Each structure stands twice: as C-alpha cells, then as structure tokens.
C-alpha cells in the first residue's frame, strides 16, 4: 500500500523519506500513539528538527485546521488512516 500525499509544502526528497517512515511505522507498531511516536522520532533523527505527528482513522470524521510555517507541513493517507506531520 502506498502513502498518498494530500498536501505538502516540503521538498520532494523529504516527502519521500517521510512516506517511508509512515509505512514502516504501520508495519512495526499497532497503537496509533506508538505509530505517531515512531514517525515523529524518525523525522526528528533524520532532519535534526522537532516534529509533531498526529495519526487518526480517517473514517471517524476527523477534521483539523493547522497553521504552520512555510515548508513545514505534510499530510497524507495510508490505508484508512490520515497522517499529519509538521515542524514545531
């Protein structure tokens, strides 16, 4: 299964790495808290910045409004889940 990028203003190479972290997070972990922590930790290590990651089931009627600095937002879908990642 592939991660669909819904919105991102991050560079393409960064997006591709994040997509890989998302797939690995879902393969290695079960609970949403553990998945989001895995993705966040991998991004923190790789990019040397602090990120916040939110993972939710998209079938639960999730909605969100985020305001971030330019070049800091990634939002994608994997299976029936939505992943939102941004630099803080």
Regions found by a protein language model. Give the residues of each.
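Charged, amphipathic alpha-helical regulatory modules used
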Residues: 1-88
């Amino acid at each position: 299964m592939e991660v669909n990028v819904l919105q991102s203003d991050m560079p393409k190479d960064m997006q591709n790495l994040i997509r890989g972290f998302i797939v690995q997070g879902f393969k290695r972990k079960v609970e949403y808290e553990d998945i989001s922590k895995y993705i966040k930790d991998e991004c923190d290590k790789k990019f040397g910045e602090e990120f916040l990651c939110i993972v939710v089931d998209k079938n639960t009627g999730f909605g969100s409004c985020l305001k971030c600095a330019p070049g800091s937002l990634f939002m994608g879908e994997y299976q029936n889940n939505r992943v939102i990642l941004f630099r803080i």
